[in-house]
Amino acid sequence: QKHITERMSKDINRLKVVLAEKKRTNKWLAEQLGKDPGTVSKWCTNTMQPNLETLVEIAKVLEVDTKDLLWSIKDNK
């Protein structure tokens, strides 16, 4: 049980990193998606995760592959 909890506390998405690479802000992304900036902020801190449909939208807006928005499970041990 402890192992599962530790795994869940690790970062899942790379949104903050990708936004920085693209020189874009949380606010810009929120506007593009029609989402609340507070929600996008929670995604960036991995407090919450976007659903899969939203992840695809984010990838399109940022012109990246969806896999670029997620940390590799292999690297996240």
Where are each of the predicted segments found?
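Residue-level signal for the short linker/turn that defines the boundary of a DNA-recognition helix
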Residues: 24, 50-53
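Short alpha-helical DNA-recognition segment
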Residues: 23-42
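Short amphipathic recognition helices of helix-turn-helix/homeodomain-type DNA-binding modules
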Residues: 68-77
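The alpha-helix within a helix-turn-helix
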Residues: 19, 30, 59
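DNA major-groove recognition helix of helix-turn-helix/homeodomain DNA-binding modules
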Residues: 53-68
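Residue-level detection of the helix-turn-helix DNA-binding "recognition helix"
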Residues: 20, 34, 45-47, 74
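A short, Lys/Arg-rich alpha-helix, primarily the initiator
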Residues: 1-25
